[in-house]
């Protein structure tokens, strides 16, 4: 991940596993990383859009094993890095090491466990290191300097910067606080920093990359398209159009930094 990238998020199994695979292949053209969310019944960090996607997936009796199967199929055609996003409860119930091994075998490059605080992640980090599984931790605008450094060191793939306070979901604009946070993280962190929560258009990507981010993470905007168009050719067209717009915004922001 040298040039800034688009990190595209999808909920696995929304609206069905075959559609997820098609969506991944479509977004792959413009994405430097794909973040695949494993649906969970209580996704506390996610806004209404992604919560609804989780419900759609789980209502079809979608299981974690199916996420691994989808990823295995994707791996037959692409080596684009894939980060699996989930919550601690499903990982704990499966057994941390068992989960990490299965994710690795499926072709995952890294994991985000949204509700696992860094201070409680010692065992998890050891297991990930043992099996060469990447880790991504999150930081918010009010994260203290020392905590930011530790989170950066613990994140082998990139540090996930939460652009604002609250839950995920598309928004119109970003506050100066977000730009200041990126600049602070850019100064403090040695690893890659990617910004998520609320990004839905090319102009957003452009402004965030211009401030120094290594990538933008887009989820709700893609999931909204899937909600509206389902498993259809039109959904694929709309997803590709948005991914292209975001990718072009990233390129513009990067040019402004040079």
Curated annotation (Swiss-Prot):
It catalyses: (1S,2R)-1-C-(indol-3-yl)glycerol 3-phosphate + L-serine = D-glyceraldehyde 3-phosphate + L-tryptophan + H2O. GO terms for cellular component: cytosol. Pathway: Amino-acid biosynthesis; L-tryptophan biosynthesis; L-tryptophan from chorismate: step 5/5. The active site is at 35 (proton acceptor), 46 (proton acceptor). It is an enzyme of class 4 (lyase). Keywords: Amino-acid biosynthesis, Aromatic amino acid biosynthesis, Lyase, Tryptophan biosynthesis. One of its GO terms (molecular function) is tryptophan synthase activity. SUPFAM superfamilies: Ribulose-phoshate binding barrel (SSF51366). InterPro entries: Aldolase_TIM (IPR013785), RibuloseP-bd_barrel (IPR011060), Trp_synthase_alpha_AS (IPR018204), Trp_synthase_suA (IPR002028). It comes from the Archaea. Transmembrane segments: none annotated. Tetramer of two alpha and two beta chains. NCBIfam families: trpA (TIGR00262). This is Tryptophan synthase alpha chain. It comes from Methanococcus maripaludis (strain DSM 14266 / JCM 13030 / NBRC 101832 / S2 / LL).
């Amino acid at each position: 991940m040298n040039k800034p990238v688009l990190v595209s998020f999808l909920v696995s199994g929304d609206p069905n596993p075959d559609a997820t695979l098609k969506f991944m292949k479509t977004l792959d053209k413009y994405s430097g990383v794909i973040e695949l969310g494993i649906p969970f019944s209580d996704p506390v960090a996610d806004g209404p859009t992604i919560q609804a996607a989780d419900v759609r997936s789980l209502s079809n009796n979608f299981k974690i094993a199916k996420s691994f199967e989808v990823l295995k199929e994707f791996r037959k055609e692409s080596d684009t890095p894939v980060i699996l996003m989930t919550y601690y409860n499903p990982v704990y119930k499966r057994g941390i090491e068992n989960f990490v091994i299965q994710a690795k075998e499926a072709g995952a490059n890294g994991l985000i466990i949204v509700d696992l605080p860094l201070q409680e992640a010692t065992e998890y980090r050891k297991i990930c290191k043992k099996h060469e599984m990447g880790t991504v931790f999150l930081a918010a605008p009010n994260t203290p300097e020392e905590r930011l450094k530790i989170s950066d060191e613990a994140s082998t793939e990139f540090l996930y910067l939460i652009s604002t306070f609250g839950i995920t979901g598309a928004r119109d604009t970003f506050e100066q606080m977000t730009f200041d946070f990126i600049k602070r993280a850019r100064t403090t962190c040695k690893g890659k920093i990617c910004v998520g929560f609320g990004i839905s258009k090319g102009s957003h990507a452009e402004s965030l990359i211009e401030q120094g981010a290594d990538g933008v993470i887009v989820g709700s905007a893609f999931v909204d398209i899937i909600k509206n168009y389902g498993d259809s050719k039109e959904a694929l067209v709309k997803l590709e159009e948005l991914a292209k717009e975001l990718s072009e915004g990233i390129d513009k922001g990067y040019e402004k930094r040079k």
